A protein has these predicted regions:
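Terminal-appendage/accessory-domain detector
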Residues: 2-215
Length: 215
């Protein structure tokens, strides 16, 4: 409408898209894990993993929380969703993240995963805390630096300010990305025909008449 400022319309560009079904502070770390998955071929030889991040990430979803359930393979999905140690271990092994498969009991209890999981420790870094609270949307960061130390002493490092899907990330989410996410989340929940109909209608809302959306 005419009473809406252009700056208000642009505000949507400062929202934080979740590409992955996990706590938002985990988004950039999943992207980091995916990158490291392509670099490290011998995950079984990992000695330790150190994650340097913001106060919030360290104390809410990291080892700074001192919550033993975050290290428990039999913890609930709701708890694992807030365990960056678990999330990072699975994403590092799988090179991906799935809203269902990544949270199953069988997945959480995989021996190789538990080994990596237990090797992870988070640390608050004032640099990341400052970025986390930056009032400038273009500077505000939810990222981290990860250092993986192998048994032979070799180190792998990756750092990312914000998730790739973030409006200021490496590949900001576009319409096709949202549509793909919709298909992934509704797979086996609704038929492909219904998904196609729904997407067609919601992208044509301005031309729909009363009663057409639920036909």
């Amino acid at each position: 409408s005419s009473d809406v400022c252009s700056s208000d319309l642009k505000a949507i560009l400062e929202t934080y898209t979740k590409e992955y079904s996990a706590e938002y502070q985990a988004q950039a770390l999943i992207d980091i894990a995916k990158k490291l998955n392509k670099r490290i071929t011998d995950l079984k030889n990992i000695n330790k993993i150190d994650i340097y991040t913001s106060h919030h990430t360290h104390y809410v979803i990291g080892t700074g929380s001192n919550d033993p359930q975050k290290m428990d393979p039999n913890a609930s999905r709701e708890t694992l969703d807030h365990s960056i140690m678990y999330i990072f271990a699975v994403a590092l092994e799988d090179g991906n993240w799935h809203h269902v498969k990544s949270y199953t009991k069988a997945r959480a209890n995989r021996k190789s995963t538990i080994k990596i999981w237990k090797s992870i420790k988070t640390h608050e870094d004032k640099k990341w805390t400052k970025k986390y609270h930056d009032p400038d949307p273009k500077k505000k960061s939810f990222g981290a630096k990860v250092i993986i130390t192998m048994k032979n002493g070799k180190k792998y490092k990756e750092e990312l300010d914000r998730a790739d899907a973030h409006p200021y990330g490496a590949r900001p989410f576009k319409r096709e990305n949202y549509i793909n996410k919709f298909h992934i989340l509704t797979d086996k929940v609704i038929s492909k025909k219904e998904a196609k109909r729904f997407l067609k209608d919601v992208q044509n809302c301005k031309n729909l008449k009363n009663g057409q959306l639920d036909k």
